[in-house]
Amino acid sequence: RMAYMEAYIAKKIHIYLESRPILSRRWKEIDPEDYKVGDGFMRSKKQLSLLKTLKNNNIIILNGPAGTGKSATITEVIEVAKDLKLSVELMAPTGRAAKVQEEYTGLPASTIHRGLCYTKTGEVSKFERESIDSDLLIIDEMSMTDIYLTYHIMKRLDFRKCKVIIVGDDAQLPSVGTGNMLHDLLKSKDIPKITLDTVYRYDDNGIMKAATDMRKGKEFLPSDLQENDVFTLGDDNNYVFYQTSDDVLLAKTLCLYKALLEQGRDPEDIQVLTAYNSGKFGVDTLNRYFQWYANPWKEDDDVIKCEDWYYHVGDFVMNIKNIYNPCDEDGHILINEMIANGDSGYITRIEKKDFWIDFNGRTYKMNQGALENMKLSYAITYHKSQGSSIQTPIIITPASHQYMLNSNLMYVGASRAK
């Protein structure tokens, strides 16, 4: 089956490369030089080349690591499409990635599942949408997209009308599903691709410098750091490294978390990243501690229990399994809607065995059983963080995780910072 999907994707892309959408003539009206200046700075030649390439091609890959201006470039392309009175559709593989897409474009974005109207009744699942006929489709975080979703996107593309921009960062982690689609598409000699490689604010932004050096496998920490040493990076000192041992790492992380809360940081803006779900420094252990600091219980709090976990109003949770046909806040079933794996929200109300949760500004009513598909999300794994944007990430790197902590994983963690 996967071999068939792979062959179909290749065939559809070949057709796409040869076709000429009806609205191509509108793209030919643009002069990229008119968009040379934006957001107060000059566009690079590679950023402008995307507009030039888009004029004559129907499918393009925009690749580049964090800080190279992918978001700014896509925002500019969207402005051009608006000027040409063209429709734009945004998709991403996860709810968190779609939310980031919405933040930097100002347009609604959906998960690929939602965009293709995925439904499931019993054991039968299918994508209801028959055709993608937007003038421009932008798929973000392609490194997280597997062959299955790529196949269903390609199957529904109307190549007579729609142009496609695939956006990704090949330094990030591949999809947990079958296939490394971004990597494979980048290897194609036929698909036009723009790779942005100039990292802006490398010297003055500590987080960007750390993320870039991690990606390149370049050492950036002093070799003589001792226990309890603190090292800052960048002119703005926004990357702070604490040297400590595993024996006190958990205690010091908790102290840091508590200090950030006392400074007035919103718990929603702080997220702890770790490599594993289990173990002393795993997600499960960390969430028990951080829940107490971020959202301590009171005696009269309404509490709902699932296994040995207790949840109450204000707790941050992540959905870890797609929920089909959920109920709105009044308990009415939302046919053909879905809460996606990876969507994050917070509990707003609890009544006996029911609770209400806000996902991305929309409230859903759920019963106690739904908690089996959720986890507290004060701490999450690097894999779950991919595609998200975090105001204040706390990245823990215990010595016991050294065999898991490769440069790609560390890069993903550091590049989540806003």
Tell where the protein language model's regions lie, with residue ranges:
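Structural beta-sheet core signal
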Residues: 90, 166, 272-274, 395
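Conserved helicase motor core of P-loop NTPases
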Residues: 8, 49-53, 170-339
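Pre-P-loop entry segment of helicase/translocase ATPase cores
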Residues: 1-52
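ASCE P-loop NTPase helicase motor core
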Residues: 48-51, 56-229
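C-terminal accessory regions
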Residues: 341-418
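Short gly/ser/thr-rich secondary-structure transition/capping motifs
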Residues: 40-44, 117-125, 299-301
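Short glycine-/polar-rich loops that comprise or flank the Walker A/P-loop
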Residues: 86, 134, 160-163, 189-194, ...
